[in-house]
Amino acid sequence: MQGSVTEFLKPRLVDIEQVNPTRAKVTLEPLERGFGHTLGNALRRILLSSMPGCAVTEVEIDGVLHEYSSKEGVQEDILEILLNLKGLAVVIEGKDEAMLTLSKSGAGPVTAADITHDGDVTIMNPDHVICHLTGNNDISMRIRVERGRGYVPASARAQTEDDDRPIGRLLVDSSFSPVARIAYNVEAARVEQRTDLDKLVIDMTTNGTIDPEEAIRRSATILAEQLDAFVELRDVTEPEQKEEKPEFDPILLRPVDDLELTVRSANCLKAEAIHYIGDLVQRTEVELLKTPNLGKKSLTEIKDVLASRGLSLGMRLENWPPASLADDL
């Protein structure tokens, strides 16, 4: 297959291999030589850093004032609990944030399944362990989940918080990306007689909140939108061409019939070879009154119709009629 030098092969989605519920391999081919690494690296960076998702941003635990402490009856310290909460895979529908609550008592593990939430919130990993209780102890907490993009450290959020932030409200480093791991591999591909093509294999692990195929589609859309600016690229030093203004107002080039005058007035104008509005506005009141069968009533009608369009009788138009109309007259 030998095409034009300006034509490039377009890849197509060939296969999606679901390795496990959160991991999949997506294969795209054929790609022109070198495009496997070009597109693979670009998609990888977007998938890791620019995909929107949901993450825990704040936590309040009853009886806890700061993260460098522990809670009686809980096996993990507070820092470990916050780290475990960062592993929650949450989907929020129809809004940008949600408040979750958790209350548990009695010895044993505390998991994401123990969290109470609204119907527009879905927790994709209910078996995720948050902490372990010992003895006949309990734990209660409120968890704020927000939609966002990229990675936002707690220190950055603290700078924007008011100084009156309640003691005990713990800020969490938030990784909003639903993609936990992404790697790509470029293999050889063949189309007919061409053997120098690329096959792109993307190995993706997510937190279960997004389908791998949808993740590829979203990342490709983001990349395409950013590249649109280069498609429309223009030399900034190139002087912009000024649009030439029309010699006459377009309304002057329209036939007098567009004024929707009475039959009597319209016939009088046609008898005087007044075919266009530009012809009409150059006439004076005295000239029109000399027109047979055109009286003051018709004159008043014509003046009112012209005034409604910002025109009047007695206007002077240089170079009238234009060449486009002169041939028709």
UniProtKB/Swiss-Prot annotation:
Keywords: DNA-directed RNA polymerase, Nucleotidyltransferase, Transcription, Transferase. Residues 1-234 are annotated as: Alpha N-terminal domain (alpha-NTD). GO terms for cellular component: cytoplasm; DNA-directed RNA polymerase complex. Residues 248-329 are annotated as: Alpha C-terminal domain (alpha-CTD). It is an enzyme of class 2 (transferase). Gene3D superfamilies: 5' to 3' exonuclease, C-terminal subdomain, DNA-directed RNA polymerase, insert domain, RNA polymerase, RBP11-like subunit. Pfam families: RNA_pol_A_bac, RNA_pol_A_CTD, RNA_pol_L. GO terms for molecular function: DNA binding; DNA-directed RNA polymerase activity; protein dimerization activity. Transmembrane segments: none annotated. InterPro entries: DNA-dir_RNA_pol_insert, DNA-dir_RNA_pol_RpoA/D/Rpb3, DNA-dir_RpoA, RBP11-like, RNAP_asu_C, RNApol_insert_sf. It comes from the Bacteria. It catalyses: RNA(n) + a ribonucleoside 5'-triphosphate = RNA(n+1) + diphosphate. Its EC number is 2.7.7.6. DNA-dependent RNA polymerase catalyzes the transcription of DNA into RNA using the four ribonucleoside triphosphates as substrates. NCBIfam families: PRK05182.1-2, PRK05182.2-5, rpoA. Homodimer. The RNAP catalytic core consists of 2 alpha, 1 beta, 1 beta' and 1 omega subunit. When a sigma factor is associated with the core the holoenzyme is formed, which can initiate transcription. This is DNA-directed RNA polymerase subunit alpha. It comes from Shewanella loihica (strain ATCC BAA-1088 / PV-4). The gene is rpoA.
